[in-house]
């Protein structure tokens, strides 16, 4: 009995591989564009959640009649937001001099009611991200983020300008958002 074989010939297989290759080349740029758009949407979502956390902490401070504590001879704003105590900005010091800050925006965690930060540190920025968001992405310093692929955002403080810059680490993008402590503003930069 003669058994007929069925299947692809070598020529048909080569043609299929070439066609699939051409389709892949045509689809790859679209796939990369979709991936970049997803990264942009991701950082915009995180920055939006962060800004909401900032405003929610400030609203809690207003709702609690602007609580403050005295440290030394100075009065500092503070609030318990979602079970965490925060130091907040103040527009005037105890003598009435302007501080160039707007009232009521989170600066750092208040762990002891005794030591308001004199400058902004990377750790303050990390603490803010981890405690203002309900489900924060993994965040660490720039040096730690470069060596750990599980870190999704690097945090860097600019103590002179009182800003926290958070850079998205996924795919080595340069997308970032900046929290301006003086004004409470959160600005996203997509690159």
Identify what each model region corresponds to.
Residues 2-42:
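N-terminal single-pass transmembrane signal-anchor helix
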Residues 13, 20, 26, 53-58, ...:
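C-terminal or internal capping secondary-structure element at the end of a domain, subdomain, or sheet
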Residues 20-21, 40-41, 51, 76-77, ...:
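Alpha-helical interaction segments
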Residues 38-67:
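Membrane-proximal N-terminal amphipathic helix
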Residues 66-77:
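Secretome/extracellular-domain signature
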Residues 75-191:
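Intrinsically disordered, low-complexity regions enriched in Pro/Ser/Thr/Gly and acidic residues
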């Amino acid at each position: 009995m003669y058994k007929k074989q069925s299947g692809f010939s070598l020529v048909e297989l080569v043609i299929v591989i070439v066609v699939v290759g051409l389709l892949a080349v045509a689809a790859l740029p679209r796939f990369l564009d979709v991936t970049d758009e997803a990264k942009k949407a991701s950082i915009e979502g995180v920055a939006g959640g962060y800004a909401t956390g900032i405003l929610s902490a400030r609203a809690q401070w207003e709702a609690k009649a602007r609580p403050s504590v005295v440290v030394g001879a100075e009065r500092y704003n503070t609030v318990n937001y979602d079970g965490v105590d925060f130091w907040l900005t103040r527009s005037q010091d105890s003598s009435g001099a302007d501080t160039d800050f707007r009232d009521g925006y989170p600066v750092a965690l208040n762990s002891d009611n005794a030591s308001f930060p004199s400058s902004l540190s990377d750790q303050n920025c990390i603490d803010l991200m981890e405690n203002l968001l309900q489900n924060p992405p993994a965040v660490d310093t720039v040096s730690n983020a470069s060596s750990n692929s599980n870190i999704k955002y690097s945090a860097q403080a600019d103590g002179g300008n009182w800003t926290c810059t958070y850079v998205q680490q996924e795919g080595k993008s340069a997308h970032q958002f900046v929290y301006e402590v003086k004004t409470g503003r959160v600005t996203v930069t997509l690159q």
